């Protein structure tokens, strides 16, 4: 299992600050990371789904996932969505980053 709260995945400073000290937010982020690694990319459009599929098939490019932040976890977060992006599929080790759209 991927453990975001112990820095096994890069997180933006904003995501880290939002999740730090809140086990329930960290647990939700780990759930999102597990979905991302299982090819459940959340709420992305068909174009991004096709691009993700091509990236996996060709071992080239990046994978993006988008997960809406549940209202009970938002806690003042202005972004309603978390993005997870895995880059450099053609050059292992890959880099996975968790960020809010406003961090991009």
Regions found by a protein language model. Give the residues of each.
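Compact soluble domain cores
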Residues: 1-71
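Short, compact, well-ordered microdomains
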Residues: 60-104
């Amino acid at each position: 299992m991927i453990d975001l709260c112990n820095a096994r995945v890069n997180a933006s400073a904003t995501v880290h600050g939002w999740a730090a000290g809140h086990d329930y937010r960290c647990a939700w982020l780990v759930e999102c990371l597990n979905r991302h690694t299982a090819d459940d990319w959340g709420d992305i459009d068909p174009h991004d789904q096709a691009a993700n599929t091509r990236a996996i098939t060709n071992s080239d490019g990046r994978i993006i996932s988008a997960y809406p932040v549940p209202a009970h976890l938002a806690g003042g977060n202005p972004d309603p969505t978390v993005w997870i992006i895995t880059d450099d599929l053609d050059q292992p080790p890959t880099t996975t980053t968790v960020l809010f759209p406003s961090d991009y």
